[in-house]
Amino acid sequence: MIFPLLLTLILPNFVAPKVLEPEKDDEIAVSTQREKTFFDMKLILTKLPTFEPSKYGHINIPLRKKRGIALHPLQWASYLWPNAEVPYDIATHYTSTEKSIILSAMEAFKNVTCVRFRPRAATDKHYLQINKYFNVERCFSYIGRQSSRTLFGTPEGNVETRMRLDPACLRGNGRGIVMHELMHILGFYHEHQRDDRDRRIVGSAVHYNFKIYRRAKTLYMGAYDANSIMHYNFQNLPWQRRDHFSTSDIININTFYKCKNLLSSKLAPKVPISPTSTSTTAITTTNTTTTKL
């Protein structure tokens, strides 16, 4: 069964503001049917500017105007998790090894940010729900905290922000993949979908994972960061081989979640940065089909 793909942002009415409905991340197919080639793409990674700790990356905050008036920050605040706290519920059918990988990824945020993932309490109405499909290998997540207006309210009146992590997502560099998906849960898009991407990466892409999001939908600040955990490793699509945050990832999270005591640039030397490739690489990924709701 192919789960629907939703990439639609419903903006609030300025006169009578509605709660913003977060977007769902693009699915990442992890099928092992290598004989089914979906696309081949050559990319050239150009020399990137040195990252400046005083500048930040991007988050999915709408930056649009209606009747000449910018949307008030309170109208997009529902994208973020209050108090930088994310209650979660992990399905019971994960193995102990799979669950430990998920928890290890959550712990990575605790080490360098004020964001905390904690088990859901009975009183938590909004929470992250981590589950998997059966007989289908996929990993995907929604972008940002779901609102009460989305399709995923439960009969009890709770609201799930859904993440799907299948066994294939948790093999190899599973921890890095989960960290990537958790960044989406916190509200971040892919770094390579920035609207200044084509100044850094040369080539044509026909896959939805490379759709560029304009500034009207995403707020960008600072230099493009190919070392971000939100940037695809083009040599190994669709898998992420990074298992650590870049300096900009840490600053982005701490900035938008107001982790004031962790914003010091002294963090930078403590975070390993993957070397940037400058070679031309051919990429092949597998066949997949997506539909829209």
Swiss-Prot record:
The protein's enzyme class: hydrolase
Disulfide bonds: 114-259, 139-169
GO biological process: proteolysis
UniProt entry tagged with the keyword Thylakoid: no
CC cofactor: Zn(2+)
Entries under SUPFAM superfamilies matching the protein: Metalloproteases ('zincins'), catalytic domain (SSF55486)
One Pfam family matching this protein: Astacin
Function per UniProt: Metalloprotease.
Name of protein: Zinc metalloproteinase nas-2
Native species: Caenorhabditis elegans
Organism taxonomic ancestry: Eukaryota, Metazoa, Ecdysozoa, Nematoda, Chromadorea
